[in-house]
Amino acid sequence: MNSLHAHLLLLAVCCVGYIASSPVIGQDQRSGDSDADVLLAADEMADNGGDNIDKRVERYAFGLGRRAYMYTNGGPGMKRLPVYNFGLGKRSRPYSFGLGKRSDYDYDQDNEIDYRVPPANYLAAERAVRPGRQNKRTTRPQPFNFGLGRR
């Protein structure tokens, strides 16, 4: 019984494969016209002599490998399109306008507390004048350091 099922399954698979590969009824059946067109176009390119370089480059540039970036500039020779590195390597940060190493915003400057002991001649009036700012140079880096040096 199992061998009968195996033979029927094999027959069914063959029938499905035949039906799937057969052309659709009512569709125009071309008897190799597309192959003839390709060969005719290739013969025309061979007749033109050296003018077929541009067509050949366009024909074989499918987007694979080096030929994906080739194009002609209208004259003799070929140029290569620029290859853009999208964030790979050392300059992976998209917008670094020279802010340098001190451009990290991982802290809140308003909540910064200076834990150093104030000097003995520290005036309370100075604190009343500038309550938010404890010291000109803080212990953490400033968010915008444009390389002006120390002041």
From Swiss-Prot:
What keywords are annotated for this sequence in UniProt?
Answer: Amidation, Cleavage on pair of basic residues, Neuropeptide, Secreted, Signal
| One Pfam family in the UniProt entry | Allatostatin
Listed GO CC annotations:
extracellular space
Q: Which residues, renumbered to this chain, carry the PTM Leucine amide?
A: 64, 88, 99, 148
**InterPro entries hit by this protein:** Allatostatin
Q: Which residues cross the membrane?
A: none
Q: Which family does it belong to?
A: Belongs to the allatostatin family.
Q: What does this protein do?
A: May act as a neurotransmitter or neuromodulator.
What name is this protein filed under?
Answer: Allatostatin-A
Lineage of the species this protein comes from: Eukaryota, Metazoa, Ecdysozoa, Arthropoda, Hexapoda
Protein's gene: AstA
